[in-house]
Amino acid sequence: MTTILAIETSCDETAAAVIENGDTIRSNVVATQMESHARFGGVVPEIASRHHVEVVTAVVEEALEKAKVTYQDLTAVAVTEGPGLVGALLVGIHAAKAIAFAHGLPLIGVHHIAGHIYANQLVAKLQFPLLALVVSGGHTELIYMEKDGQFQVIGQTRDDAVGEAYDKVARALALPYPGGPNVEQLADTAEATLDLPRSWLEKDSYDFSFSGLKSAVLNRLNNDKQRGIVTDRAALAKGFQESVVDVLVAKTVRAQAQFNVKQVVLAGGVAANKGLRKALTEAFANKDVTLLVPPLSLCTDNAAMIGACAHSMWLRGIAGNMAMNARPGLPLSSF
Protein backbone atom coordinates (compact mmCIF):
# COMPACT_ATOMS: atom_id res chain seq x y z
CA MET A 1 0.00 0.00 0.00
CA THR A 2 1.21 3.51 -0.80
CA THR A 3 0.15 6.63 1.05
CA ILE A 4 1.24 9.86 -0.60
CA LEU A 5 0.98 13.39 0.76
CA ALA A 6 0.57 15.75 -2.20
CA ILE A 7 0.92 19.54 -2.31
CA GLU A 8 -0.27 21.88 -5.09
CA THR A 9 0.51 25.63 -5.21
CA SER A 10 1.04 26.35 -8.90
CA CYS A 11 -1.36 29.30 -9.11
CA ASP A 12 -3.96 30.63 -6.67
CA GLU A 13 -5.10 27.53 -4.79
CA THR A 14 -3.18 26.20 -1.79
CA ALA A 15 -3.97 22.50 -1.69
CA ALA A 16 -2.88 19.34 0.08
CA ALA A 17 -4.23 15.81 -0.13
CA VAL A 18 -3.51 12.30 1.06
CA ILE A 19 -3.94 9.66 -1.65
CA GLU A 20 -3.90 5.92 -1.03
CA ASN A 21 -2.81 3.50 -3.77
CA GLY A 22 -3.27 6.16 -6.44
CA ASP A 23 -7.04 5.89 -6.60
CA THR A 24 -8.45 6.56 -3.13
CA ILE A 25 -8.80 10.06 -1.67
CA ARG A 26 -8.21 10.00 2.07
CA SER A 27 -8.35 13.81 2.21
CA ASN A 28 -8.39 16.71 -0.23
CA VAL A 29 -8.07 20.22 1.22
CA VAL A 30 -8.13 23.39 -0.88
CA ALA A 31 -7.73 26.97 0.37
CA THR A 32 -8.88 29.31 -2.37
CA GLN A 33 -7.70 32.87 -2.97
CA MET A 34 -10.50 33.79 -5.38
CA GLU A 35 -11.81 36.73 -3.37
CA SER A 36 -8.34 38.25 -3.04
CA HIS A 37 -7.84 38.31 -6.81
CA ALA A 38 -11.40 39.09 -7.92
CA ARG A 39 -11.05 42.85 -7.56
CA PHE A 40 -8.04 42.77 -9.91
CA GLY A 41 -9.89 40.74 -12.53
CA GLY A 42 -7.25 37.99 -12.47
CA VAL A 43 -4.49 36.37 -10.45
CA VAL A 44 -1.77 38.69 -9.11
CA PRO A 45 1.38 36.51 -8.76
CA GLU A 46 2.87 38.27 -5.72
CA ILE A 47 -0.41 38.18 -3.82
CA ALA A 48 -0.80 34.50 -4.69
CA SER A 49 2.66 33.68 -3.33
CA ARG A 50 2.06 35.55 -0.08
CA HIS A 51 -1.22 33.75 0.52
CA HIS A 52 0.46 30.39 -0.09
CA VAL A 53 3.10 31.21 2.53
CA GLU A 54 0.42 32.16 5.04
CA VAL A 55 -1.68 28.99 4.79
CA VAL A 56 0.39 26.12 3.35
CA THR A 57 1.36 24.67 6.74
CA ALA A 58 -2.20 24.75 8.04
CA VAL A 59 -3.53 23.19 4.82
CA VAL A 60 -1.02 20.32 5.02
CA GLU A 61 -1.83 19.70 8.68
CA GLU A 62 -5.56 19.68 7.92
CA ALA A 63 -5.05 17.16 5.11
CA LEU A 64 -3.14 14.81 7.43
CA GLU A 65 -5.71 15.22 10.19
CA LYS A 66 -8.66 14.51 7.90
CA ALA A 67 -6.91 11.45 6.50
CA LYS A 68 -6.10 10.27 10.03
CA VAL A 69 -2.45 9.67 9.15
CA THR A 70 0.87 10.90 10.49
CA TYR A 71 4.13 11.60 8.68
CA GLN A 72 5.30 8.15 9.76
CA ASP A 73 2.47 6.58 7.73
CA LEU A 74 3.53 8.23 4.47
CA THR A 75 5.27 6.50 1.57
CA ALA A 76 6.36 9.71 -0.18
CA VAL A 77 5.71 13.43 -0.58
CA ALA A 78 4.62 14.80 -3.96
CA VAL A 79 4.49 18.39 -5.14
CA THR A 80 3.75 20.31 -8.31
CA GLU A 81 7.10 21.13 -9.94
CA GLY A 82 5.66 23.13 -12.87
CA PRO A 83 4.33 24.74 -14.92
CA GLY A 84 2.87 27.68 -13.02
CA LEU A 85 3.76 30.92 -11.29
CA VAL A 86 7.36 30.66 -10.12
CA GLY A 87 6.79 32.26 -6.72
CA ALA A 88 3.72 30.16 -6.06
CA LEU A 89 5.46 26.95 -7.11
CA LEU A 90 8.40 27.67 -4.82
CA VAL A 91 6.18 27.84 -1.74
CA GLY A 92 4.83 24.35 -2.32
CA ILE A 93 8.21 22.93 -3.29
CA HIS A 94 9.95 24.29 -0.19
CA ALA A 95 7.15 22.96 2.02
CA ALA A 96 7.42 19.52 0.42
CA LYS A 97 11.21 19.53 0.68
CA ALA A 98 11.05 20.41 4.37
CA ILE A 99 8.64 17.56 5.08
CA ALA A 100 10.62 15.06 2.99
CA PHE A 101 13.93 16.02 4.64
CA ALA A 102 12.55 16.07 8.18
CA HIS A 103 10.90 12.66 7.88
CA GLY A 104 13.25 10.88 5.47
CA LEU A 105 10.64 10.56 2.73
CA PRO A 106 11.13 10.35 -1.05
CA LEU A 107 10.19 13.53 -2.95
CA ILE A 108 8.24 13.32 -6.22
CA GLY A 109 7.92 16.31 -8.56
CA VAL A 110 4.74 16.27 -10.65
CA HIS A 111 3.79 18.11 -13.84
CA HIS A 112 0.64 20.16 -13.22
CA ILE A 113 -1.05 19.15 -16.50
CA ALA A 114 -0.19 15.49 -15.98
CA GLY A 115 -1.91 15.87 -12.62
CA HIS A 116 -5.08 17.14 -14.28
CA ILE A 117 -5.10 14.10 -16.56
CA TYR A 118 -4.51 11.65 -13.70
CA ALA A 119 -7.36 13.21 -11.71
CA ASN A 120 -9.44 10.84 -13.81
CA GLN A 121 -7.62 7.91 -12.17
CA LEU A 122 -9.61 8.86 -9.07
CA VAL A 123 -12.81 8.29 -11.08
CA ALA A 124 -11.98 5.09 -12.98
CA LYS A 125 -8.91 3.15 -14.07
CA LEU A 126 -7.07 4.78 -16.96
CA GLN A 127 -6.91 2.54 -20.03
CA PHE A 128 -4.05 3.12 -22.46
CA PRO A 129 -3.76 4.24 -25.15
CA LEU A 130 -6.01 7.21 -24.39
CA LEU A 131 -6.71 10.74 -25.53
CA ALA A 132 -6.89 13.67 -23.10
CA LEU A 133 -8.52 17.03 -23.73
CA VAL A 134 -6.96 19.48 -21.27
CA VAL A 135 -8.76 22.81 -20.96
CA SER A 136 -7.81 25.37 -18.33
CA GLY A 137 -6.90 29.00 -17.75
CA GLY A 138 -3.41 28.55 -19.13
CA HIS A 139 -3.64 25.44 -21.29
CA THR A 140 -5.69 24.02 -24.14
CA GLU A 141 -4.19 20.78 -25.40
CA LEU A 142 -5.06 17.47 -27.00
CA ILE A 143 -2.70 14.83 -25.63
CA TYR A 144 -2.23 11.26 -26.86
CA MET A 145 -0.94 8.80 -24.27
CA GLU A 146 0.18 5.50 -25.77
CA LYS A 147 1.08 4.19 -22.33
CA ASP A 148 1.29 5.24 -18.70
CA GLY A 149 3.52 8.29 -18.29
CA GLN A 150 4.02 8.91 -22.01
CA PHE A 151 2.61 12.21 -23.32
CA GLN A 152 2.39 13.32 -26.95
CA VAL A 153 0.89 16.76 -27.46
CA ILE A 154 -0.93 16.51 -30.81
CA GLY A 155 -2.73 19.84 -30.58
CA GLN A 156 -2.47 23.03 -28.54
CA THR A 157 -3.60 26.63 -28.57
CA ARG A 158 -1.68 29.02 -30.80
CA ASP A 159 -2.75 32.06 -28.80
CA ASP A 160 -5.25 32.29 -25.93
CA ALA A 161 -6.01 29.26 -23.80
CA VAL A 162 -9.73 28.62 -23.57
CA GLY A 163 -9.91 29.67 -19.92
CA GLU A 164 -8.01 32.85 -20.72
CA ALA A 165 -10.48 33.60 -23.53
CA TYR A 166 -13.38 33.13 -21.11
CA ASP A 167 -11.81 35.59 -18.65
CA LYS A 168 -11.23 38.22 -21.35
CA VAL A 169 -14.76 37.87 -22.72
CA ALA A 170 -16.13 38.07 -19.18
CA ARG A 171 -14.35 41.40 -18.65
CA ALA A 172 -15.74 42.69 -21.95
CA LEU A 173 -19.23 41.69 -20.81
CA ALA A 174 -18.67 43.39 -17.43
CA LEU A 175 -18.81 40.07 -15.58
CA PRO A 176 -16.79 39.36 -12.43
CA TYR A 177 -13.77 37.07 -12.09
CA PRO A 178 -13.50 34.14 -12.60
CA GLY A 179 -14.84 34.45 -16.12
CA GLY A 180 -15.69 30.84 -16.99
CA PRO A 181 -18.60 30.15 -14.65
CA ASN A 182 -19.98 33.67 -15.01
CA VAL A 183 -20.01 33.58 -18.83
CA GLU A 184 -21.66 30.15 -18.67
CA GLN A 185 -24.27 31.38 -16.19
CA LEU A 186 -25.11 34.36 -18.40
CA ALA A 187 -25.28 32.14 -21.50
CA ASP A 188 -27.77 29.86 -19.75
CA THR A 189 -30.23 32.77 -19.53
CA ALA A 190 -30.15 33.48 -23.28
CA GLU A 191 -33.30 33.15 -25.34
CA ALA A 192 -31.36 33.46 -28.60
CA THR A 193 -27.82 33.02 -29.92
CA LEU A 194 -25.58 35.49 -31.71
CA ASP A 195 -23.66 33.47 -34.29
CA LEU A 196 -19.88 33.82 -33.97
CA PRO A 197 -17.02 32.38 -36.07
CA ARG A 198 -15.37 29.01 -35.46
CA SER A 199 -11.61 28.84 -35.88
CA TRP A 200 -10.83 25.47 -37.46
CA LEU A 201 -7.31 26.38 -38.71
CA GLU A 202 -5.78 23.98 -41.27
CA LYS A 203 -7.83 20.97 -42.34
CA ASP A 204 -5.77 18.34 -40.52
CA SER A 205 -4.65 20.47 -37.58
CA TYR A 206 -5.54 19.66 -33.99
CA ASP A 207 -4.36 23.08 -32.83
CA PHE A 208 -6.73 25.68 -31.42
CA SER A 209 -7.08 29.44 -31.72
CA PHE A 210 -9.43 31.59 -29.67
CA SER A 211 -8.05 35.10 -30.19
CA GLY A 212 -10.19 35.64 -33.29
CA LEU A 213 -13.32 34.57 -31.44
CA LYS A 214 -12.45 36.89 -28.57
CA SER A 215 -11.96 39.74 -31.06
CA ALA A 216 -15.33 38.96 -32.66
CA VAL A 217 -17.02 39.41 -29.27
CA LEU A 218 -15.21 42.71 -28.66
CA ASN A 219 -16.05 43.95 -32.17
CA ARG A 220 -19.72 43.13 -31.73
CA LEU A 221 -19.83 45.06 -28.46
CA ASN A 222 -17.98 48.06 -29.93
CA ASN A 223 -20.06 48.14 -33.12
CA ASP A 224 -23.32 47.97 -31.19
CA LYS A 225 -22.14 50.76 -28.89
CA GLN A 226 -21.23 53.03 -31.82
CA ARG A 227 -24.63 52.42 -33.41
CA GLY A 228 -26.51 53.00 -30.17
CA ILE A 229 -27.71 49.39 -29.98
CA VAL A 230 -28.10 47.59 -26.67
CA THR A 231 -26.24 44.30 -27.07
CA ASP A 232 -27.99 41.13 -26.01
CA ARG A 233 -25.17 40.13 -23.65
CA ALA A 234 -26.69 36.74 -22.85
CA ALA A 235 -27.03 35.84 -26.53
CA LEU A 236 -23.45 36.97 -27.14
CA ALA A 237 -22.20 34.86 -24.23
CA LYS A 238 -24.12 31.87 -25.59
CA GLY A 239 -22.70 32.38 -29.06
CA PHE A 240 -19.18 32.55 -27.63
CA GLN A 241 -19.64 29.39 -25.60
CA GLU A 242 -21.18 27.45 -28.50
CA SER A 243 -18.26 28.39 -30.74
CA VAL A 244 -15.71 27.25 -28.15
CA VAL A 245 -17.48 23.97 -27.43
CA ASP A 246 -18.06 23.14 -31.10
CA VAL A 247 -14.34 23.40 -31.92
CA LEU A 248 -13.14 21.54 -28.81
CA VAL A 249 -15.56 18.67 -29.32
CA ALA A 250 -15.08 18.34 -33.09
CA LYS A 251 -11.29 18.13 -32.84
CA THR A 252 -11.46 15.68 -29.94
CA VAL A 253 -13.84 13.40 -31.87
CA ARG A 254 -11.61 13.51 -34.96
CA ALA A 255 -8.47 12.76 -32.92
CA GLN A 256 -10.18 9.83 -31.19
CA ALA A 257 -11.01 8.32 -34.56
CA GLN A 258 -7.55 8.87 -36.02
CA PHE A 259 -5.66 7.48 -33.03
CA ASN A 260 -8.28 4.77 -32.46
CA VAL A 261 -8.30 5.09 -28.67
CA LYS A 262 -11.01 3.51 -26.54
CA GLN A 263 -10.81 6.02 -23.70
CA VAL A 264 -11.08 9.81 -23.79
CA VAL A 265 -10.54 11.90 -20.66
CA LEU A 266 -11.52 15.49 -19.97
CA ALA A 267 -9.25 17.48 -17.67
CA GLY A 268 -8.62 21.00 -16.36
CA GLY A 269 -10.60 23.82 -14.81
CA VAL A 270 -12.77 24.42 -17.88
CA ALA A 271 -13.81 20.75 -17.65
CA ALA A 272 -16.32 22.05 -15.10
CA ASN A 273 -18.25 23.74 -17.93
CA LYS A 274 -21.66 22.06 -18.20
CA GLY A 275 -22.00 22.78 -21.90
CA LEU A 276 -18.67 21.14 -22.72
CA ARG A 277 -19.36 18.12 -20.53
CA LYS A 278 -22.78 17.63 -22.13
CA ALA A 279 -21.50 18.04 -25.70
CA LEU A 280 -18.64 15.57 -25.22
CA THR A 281 -20.96 13.06 -23.57
CA GLU A 282 -23.37 13.28 -26.50
CA ALA A 283 -20.56 13.09 -29.07
CA PHE A 284 -19.26 9.77 -27.72
CA ALA A 285 -22.60 8.31 -26.61
CA ASN A 286 -22.95 5.99 -29.61
CA LYS A 287 -19.27 5.18 -30.05
CA ASP A 288 -17.23 2.33 -28.62
CA VAL A 289 -15.40 4.79 -26.39
CA THR A 290 -15.29 5.38 -22.64
CA LEU A 291 -15.43 9.06 -21.72
CA LEU A 292 -14.09 9.99 -18.29
CA VAL A 293 -15.22 13.32 -16.86
CA PRO A 294 -13.94 14.23 -13.38
CA PRO A 295 -16.30 15.55 -10.69
CA LEU A 296 -16.28 19.32 -10.29
CA SER A 297 -14.07 19.10 -7.19
CA LEU A 298 -11.31 17.52 -9.30
CA CYS A 299 -11.56 19.89 -12.28
CA THR A 300 -10.09 22.99 -10.68
CA ASP A 301 -6.62 22.91 -9.11
CA ASN A 302 -6.33 20.42 -6.26
CA ALA A 303 -3.69 18.20 -4.69
CA ALA A 304 -5.56 14.90 -5.06
CA MET A 305 -4.72 14.90 -8.77
CA ILE A 306 -1.03 15.48 -7.94
CA GLY A 307 -1.10 12.50 -5.59
CA ALA A 308 -2.75 10.29 -8.21
CA CYS A 309 -0.08 11.15 -10.78
CA ALA A 310 2.69 10.75 -8.20
CA HIS A 311 1.51 7.21 -7.46
CA SER A 312 1.88 6.31 -11.14
CA MET A 313 5.39 7.76 -11.11
CA TRP A 314 6.25 5.91 -7.90
CA LEU A 315 5.25 2.60 -9.48
CA ARG A 316 7.52 3.41 -12.43
CA GLY A 317 10.43 4.13 -10.11
CA ILE A 318 10.46 7.88 -10.69
CA ALA A 319 11.35 10.21 -7.83
CA GLY A 320 13.09 13.54 -7.47
CA ASN A 321 15.67 14.81 -5.04
CA MET A 322 16.33 17.77 -2.79
CA ALA A 323 17.77 19.73 -5.71
CA MET A 324 14.29 20.07 -7.20
CA ASN A 325 13.39 23.63 -8.20
CA ALA A 326 10.37 25.43 -9.61
CA ARG A 327 10.03 25.02 -13.38
CA PRO A 328 7.40 27.58 -14.43
CA GLY A 329 7.65 26.75 -18.14
CA LEU A 330 8.00 22.98 -17.79
CA PRO A 331 6.83 21.37 -21.08
CA LEU A 332 4.82 18.19 -20.81
CA SER A 333 6.85 16.58 -23.59
CA SER A 334 10.00 16.66 -21.42
CA PHE A 335 8.31 15.41 -18.27
From Swiss-Prot:
Any one of the GO BP annotations: tRNA threonylcarbamoyladenosine modification
What family is it from? Answer: Belongs to the KAE1 / TsaD family.
What GO MF annotations does this protein's record show?
A: iron ion binding; N(6)-L-threonylcarbamoyladenine synthase activity
Reaction(s) catalysed by this chain, per the record, are: L-threonylcarbamoyladenylate + adenosine(37) in tRNA = N(6)-L-threonylcarbamoyladenosine(37) in tRNA + AMP + H(+)
What is this protein's name?
A: tRNA N6-adenosine threonylcarbamoyltransferase
**HAMAP family attached here?**
TsaD
Where in or outside the cell is it found? Cytoplasm
| Keyword tags | Acyltransferase, Cytoplasm, Iron, Metal-binding, Transferase, tRNA processing
GO cellular component annotations of the record: cytoplasm
- What CDD domains does this protein's entry cite? ASKHA_NBD_TsaD_bac
Residues the entry annotates as binding Fe cation: 112, 116, 301
| Family matches, as PROSITE patterns | GLYCOPROTEASE (PS01016)
Encoding gene per record: tsaD
Report the co-factor binding details.
Answer: Binds 1 Fe(2+) ion per subunit.
Q: Which EC class is the enzyme in? A: transferase
